[in-house]
């Protein structure tokens, strides 16, 4: 991995190639508040950016956080999970900065998680409803990675009303 300076907070992972050059997917355990805020803000996830302390607690308490960075160390995207690492893995967040959409970054992040949690009975995530523009894009993306809706798996999912 020439050209990379891996700091102690990062565990080197798999490499992917985005159209702009090599991308490193790595586990991170220490998070720069401003950098994480900028990434969540770039995709307009106000539910996170409206309470940055809570966002940082969520990152710290995740089972796994992986990032995608370019050769200069710029954060391109990240994904995080909540898991018992035995039966269930829930993909909590997958974000890619809009400047890097449609370059394979999100795919590399999710493929890394699929491999990491292949032993789990359930590998789940939630996304926007397909009646929304973002939902249509997300559904197509996750389907291209082999995901099925709960209904297609003859399952149901339930949730309480959103707390704002």
Could you say what each language-model-derived stretch is?
Residues 3-49, 153:
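Short amphipathic alpha-helix that is part of the acyltransferase structural core
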Residues 96, 102-115:
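Conserved acetyl-CoA-binding loop-helix of GNAT-fold acetyltransferases
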Residues 55-95:
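A conserved beta-strand-loop-helix scaffold within acyl/acetyltransferase catalytic domains
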Residues 33, 49-53, 107, 136:
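Structural motif corresponding to alpha-helix initiation and N-cap regions
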Residues 107, 119-124, 129-163:
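Conserved active-site alpha-helix within GNAT-family acetyltransferase domains
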